Amino acid sequence: MAMVKANAYGHGLIETSTILASLGIDCFGVAFSSEAVLLRQAGITLPIIMMTPPEDEDIYAIIKYSIETVICTEHHLRELSKQAKEKNALIKVHTYIDTGMHRDGFDPSHTLKFIELLHSFSNLQWAGICTHLATSDSSDTSFMDKQLSIFYQCIEQLKQEGYTIPRIHMSNSAGMIRKPSYAAGMVRLGLSLYGYNVIGDIEVPNVLPVMSIESRVLSLRRIKKGESVSYGRSFIADTDTTIATIPIGYGDGLFRHLSNKISFIINGKFYPVIGNICMDECMVNIGDDPCSVSDRVIIIGSQGECSQDAKDIATIIDTIPYEITTAISNRVPRRIE
């Protein structure tokens, strides 16, 4: 399953999904029905699984656009069945067991009862059984092992009761890398699909980020020692210097927390962003180096011997690369090369 939620982790939902469909992906994973609807309207016909439990308002779209969904409550069963019956439809569902993350899913002790109830609704088809791993990116696998043990105990119980188990899925990107033997059935590829190794202690060869973000130098100005830059005057020049204005800001997903911390690559060299990042623009200290209006500016990517990816930026503000890529707003054009 290719996870394309949150605008394909910031890479562009439709652009990314169209390419993945042509490369043989089996199905897509989304968080919300609105994302699935966009895929269907773009002509994507592969199975789409909504990995966030549905609200009643989602069911119309689930039926109309043939969206599969995870479920974890009796209300889900009854409301899905009710609306499916009214539309003479069949809804494919994936039963979600909470093995310890405590975000979504039903208690493992309720597994048999839940599956028995599911099978009493003729217009619901059991298409999958799943859970979610909370610590698969950690080298300490004790909690992950506990979750897997609980999950497979539930599956074994169902087998002993004579149930044919549908598609099994619980491994995210880190889980697939950490415990490949448990990747049977289906894996839910997230950030690793976009070229990031989500586990620091295990090397994954030939995985490179597919995203680059570029801008251009919008204008140049010379400022004198003692003059300030941007809102709040958080940067005061300690010498005469050249400032380049770049048309990208926090309205595009460049966090204001990166002010006076991040650097961009221009003409094969890193230059620091100075002053507070604005909504639409930010400023870079060029010093006395040569620079021209319209020169390329690399925010994520490489030029010459310099490179920077979402992991590098995430480290600056003590967060995760997921937050960096998913924050990129829709006003940043997506282009496939």
Regions found by a protein language model. Give the residues of each.
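Active-site-proximal beta-alpha core segment in soluble small-molecule metabolic enzymes
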Residues: M1-H169
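Active-site anion/phosphate-binding pocket segments in diverse small-molecule metabolic enzymes
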Residues: S34-E35, P54-D56, A61, C72-E79, ...
